[in-house]
Amino acid sequence: MVSIFIRTYKRDIAWLDLCLQSIRNNLKGWDEIVVCIPEGQEHHLRYAKDVRIVTSPVFPNDYIGQQVSKLLCHHYIKGDMVLIVDSDLVFLPGASVQDYLENGKPRILTNKWPVPADKLAIKWRPIIGKLFGKEPPCSFMQGHGARLFLKSTLQSFSAHFPDIEAYARKQPRKEFSEFQFLGFFIYLNEPQNYLLLDINEVPMAQYHTQQFWNVDGITKITLDELAQYNLHPQWPNTLSPWDQFRRQLRQVTRRTKQWFNSLSHKNT
């Protein structure tokens, strides 16, 4: 049995609408969809049909909170495998859970740290080493908006790190990565259960997906592209007027900063 687990939040609901449509229209090989949202935001999922809705604890920083939800998703799912999906991912015609398997095993993509180390290696090796007590030989962040894991792996990870939620709450926003941690755990403890592939040594597998995320939300250009796959927004906007105003304010602030940065570059 294969579960799909999607961790969302109130500002991603418009994307989730399209993601769920694409799963039902295009993705083959799954048995259930579990949608997780922070406690207190359940009303934003009132238009979701034929999914199981669960809640996760509220974090001061939900960027870390959503990662912890994925690490602990074995508490919510029924399947013996779980496809963890970003809510802004769209599955295209021909998509199948089999896309994430090779020789019957979930595929884990790796990328060796360069020599000499680049900024990415310098940043992530000690962050991963802080949790594990040793540094990894490669990065495990390679992915396409969806990753397949065995439920037993998540259970084992949780047993090995029973205080991972408390640990996460103490970490800075950009010093926690659920997929770096899971990947290294698999590398150390369960390499026989997965196919670990270095992206520099093998051809890239074909994934029938596209990630449409845009800091400006769902633009007309994005809508036109999605319409080619018969995907159209179906849910009304669930954000409050205040949340909509805050989103617009952030967009204006970001564009203003970009404009000032472009001016400073021209003057240098």
What is each residue range found by the language model?
Residues 82:
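Short aromatic/hydrophobic "clamp" motif used to bind/position activated sugar donors
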Residues 86-90:
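The conserved acidic donor/metal-binding loop of glycosyltransferases
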Residues 1-18:
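N-proximal low-complexity "stem/linker" segments adjacent to membrane-targeting elements
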Residues 1, 120-148, 220-268:
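Membrane-proximal basic amphipathic "stem/tether" segments
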Residues 135-215:
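Catalytic core and acceptor-binding pocket of nucleotide-sugar-dependent glycosyltransferases
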Residues 38-76:
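Active-site-proximal specificity loops/subdomain of glycosyltransferases
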Residues 91-124:
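Conserved donor-nucleotide/metal-binding helix-loop-beta segment in metal-dependent transferases, i.e.
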Residues 21-30:
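Short, acidic, metal-binding catalytic loop of nucleotide-sugar glycosyltransferases
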